Amino acid sequence: MFISGVHSHERNIILKYCVGQGINVFVIPRVGDVIMSGSQPMHMFHLPVLRVGRYMASPEYLFVKRLMDIVVSLVGLVILSPLFLITAIAVKSDGGPAFYKQVRLTKDGKPFEILKFRSMRVDAEKDGVARLSTGDKDDRITKVGHVIRACRLDELPQLLNILKGDLSIVGPRPERPEIAAQYCEEMPEFALRLQAKAGLTGYAQVYGKYNTTPYDKLQMDLMYIAHPSLIEDLKICLLYTSDAADDK
């Protein structure tokens, strides 16, 4: 049974009945449900209590994850250096710079410059207005840009961001400050997404689809942040690698 969009009172009645009858229930959560899923059970004043607070991954998890980031980014930079050179030469063939820097937000809203191979025209945002890409039909994308985007090669320089510590391999994808501000106006819960370091790929990227709504992607990212797991990180990395191979 699936439950979605049901008022909490009616939902509780349905859940109690289904659990009592041994019926599996799949609940499509609201953001509040996702936040509660990361709560810590306690007892206080002889009462069961759920402590809900800032998402805090364990120091051990953060240490191992950072170690993995350093090792993978270093190995990747060495092994893929010939591909870096070939891609840079191809991108520069249209007369513009090979690399493109853009301000994005990572943990706690800290701004940093994300590094990518340029896939759009140099004057793609000459009016200074931030615009989300509309996909393959975006006329700002160059011929070489279409190829490197399809193969995910435009993201290779982000290994430098990972090595530096601005990004992790896995985490919510970093947004531009203007886009993040817009999302925060539409979805105030979006600010919770900044409680984790941004990533090269993330839960919403590998499990979401092209038509997945920003709200549903937000819930996916918050679910990931609420339940930090190295096993889940590994699964996301494998799915990302598989998707990239399929694109090629």
Task: Spell out what each predicted region is.
Residues 189-242:
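C-terminal terminal-structure detector
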Residues 42, 100-105, 194-195:
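Short acidic-hydrophobic surface loop/beta-edge motif
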Residues 32, 100-140, 200-219:
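Short, glycine-rich, amphipathic interfacial segments at transmembrane boundaries or analogous
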Residues 243-248:
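A short, hydrophobic C-terminal helix/tail in secreted or cell-surface proteins
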Residues 22, 27-29, 157-160, 206-209:
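Hydrophobic alpha-helical segments characteristic of transmembrane helices
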Residues 134-197, 236:
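A short, structured surface patch at a secondary-structure boundary
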Residues 60-124, 161, 230, 236-242:
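A hydrophobic, helix-centered structural microdomain
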Residues 1-78:
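N-terminal hydrophobic signal-anchor/signal peptide
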